[in-house]
Curated annotation (Swiss-Prot):
Recorded metabolic or biological pathway in which this protein acts: Amino-sugar metabolism; 1,6-anhydro-N-acetylmuramate degradation; Cell wall biogenesis; peptidoglycan recycling
Protein name: Anhydro-N-acetylmuramic acid kinase
Organism for this UniProt entry: Prochlorococcus marinus (strain NATL1A)
Gene from which the chain derives: anmK
Function: Catalyzes the specific phosphorylation of 1,6-anhydro-N-acetylmuramic acid (anhMurNAc) with the simultaneous cleavage of the 1,6-anhydro ring, generating MurNAc-6-P. Is required for the utilization of anhMurNAc either imported from the medium or derived from its own cell wall murein, and thus plays a role in cell wall recycling.
Catalytic activity: 1,6-anhydro-N-acetyl-beta-muramate + ATP + H2O = N-acetyl-D-muramate 6-phosphate + ADP + H(+)
Annotated EC: 2.7.1.170
NCBIfam families to which the protein is assigned, alphabetical: PRK09585.2-5
Pfam family of the protein (one): AnmK
Family under the similarity heading: Belongs to the anhydro-N-acetylmuramic acid kinase family.
Top-rank EC class of the record's enzyme: transferase
């Protein structure tokens, strides 16, 4: 079955589209990518998305027009990736504007902006969208949803395997081994903390918007990370919350960056970027240390996906700090890093079409199996 997946993440840099052919057992599918397309948001759209996500108040008219524009851009990406409309289903995540983690006294919340019925009619195809609301209604965080699909896409090894996504936010999937006493264990997943969100903001600020990200980690590699400050940051209570846990740009965004910059004082942009990038690697390393400390789980391999996997400085820091773990890009096992999340939502859309529910208890914390996504027919 052919499915088109559309994804735009918390980095808000654009839309990734992937056309996939799925066959076989939905839990262990065979899949083949037939085409891909990536659309970069115009700077005006990206700025508006980030500003609204950071709390900018806009009128109802502006809100509607932003939703229409994002929907139309997703339609453009879909048509470009699948010009003959061969997909039986189109799965579209929409653009996240706000995410609220579950608190003891308050349910979680997550807002993705997309007009699903409009997209279905623009494409004249079945659309699956609104993937997070059922999970949240069932007491879950609604994130990280990629962890629900990773095992099906990458499979198991003879030891514990991790999949790390480095988008705006870093999240981890922990996949049990295929043999031994742990083979009946559950797949785990959680949001770790900031990845590209802080670094991208800092790069833009420190270069007066001449750069929007640290390509290949070139700026970070010229700086010296402030390790004492990083050790202090790692004591943030969020990093000690037991999974399932989730977060977003509203927690690790502009205001958080300003607070951390104040603590760092007057330092060069290279030292700033190096410190923030090393901070991300340290968060992951601390999570893996705690995974062994509290659950006696030690990874043999960590596959890295997302834009951060192209950051050579960050990849070196991960290998340095995650002792005894083989760290490598997910591309090396045939999963295209840039399109992994689009592939995930294509998979969830395929499962929705088939009526396949997923048990998210150990990943999002939702209390019952869920059929992810809402179907709209044209």
């Amino acid at each position: 079955m052919r499915v088109l997946g559309l994804m735009s993440g918390t980095s808000a840099d654009g839309i990734d589209a992937v056309l996939v052919d799925f066959t076989g057992d939905p839990s262990k599918p065979k899949w083949q990518i037939l085409n891909t397309f990536s659309y970069e948001y115009p700077s005006s759209i990206r700025e508006k998305i980030i500003q609204v996500g950071q709390g900018l108040k806009i009128s109802s008219k502006d809100w509607l027009e932003l939703a229409e524009e994002i929907t139309e851009l997703n339609a453009f990406a879909a048509r470009t990736c699948d010009p003959d409309s061969t997909a039986e289903v189109v799965g579209c995540h929409g653009q996240t504007l706000f995410h609220r983690s579950v608190k003891k006294s308050k349910r979680g919340g997550s807002l993705q902006i997309l007009l699903g019925p409009l997209l279905a009619n623009l494409l004249d195809q079945i659309v699956i969208y609104d993937f997070r609301s059922k999970d949240i209604a069932s007491g879950g965080h609604g994130a990280p949803l990629v962890a629900l699909v990773d095992e099906a896409l990458v499979g198991r090894l003879y030891g514990w395997r991790g999949v790390l996504n480095l988008g705006g936010i870093a999240n981890l999937t922990i996949i049990p081994p295929k043999t031994g006493i742990d083979k009946t264990s559950q797949c785990l997943g959680w949001d770790c903390g900031p990845a590209n969100s802080l670094v991208d903001l800092a790069v833009k600020e420190s270069t007066n918007s001449s750069l929007t990200f640290d390509e290949n980690g070139s700026l970070a590699s010229l700086g010296i990370p402030k390790l004492e400050i990083i050790d202090k940051w790692l004591r943030d209570p969020f990093f000690y919350l037991e999974p399932p846990r989730s977060t977003g740009r509203e927690q690790f965004g502009f205001q958080y960056l300003q607070k951390r910059k104040k603590e760092l004082g007057d330092i060069s942009k290279e030292d700033l970027i190096s410190t923030l990038t090393t901070f991300t690697a340290s968060i992951i390393s601390q999570d893996l240390d705690n995974l062994f400390k509290f659950k006696q789980i030690r990874l043999i391999e960590l596959l890295v996906a997302g834009g951060g996997s192209k950051n050579l400085f960050l990849m070196r820091q991960l290998q340095k700090q995650c002792c005894g773990v083989h760290v490598r890009p997910i591309n090396e096992i045939g999963v295209p890093s840039q399109y992994r999340e689009a592939l995930v939502f294509a998979t969830l859309s395929w499962w929705n079409f088939l009526g396949k529910k997923v048990n998210p208890k150990y990943i999002t914390g939702a209390k019952k199996p869920i059929l992810y996504g809402v179907r709209v027919d044209p």
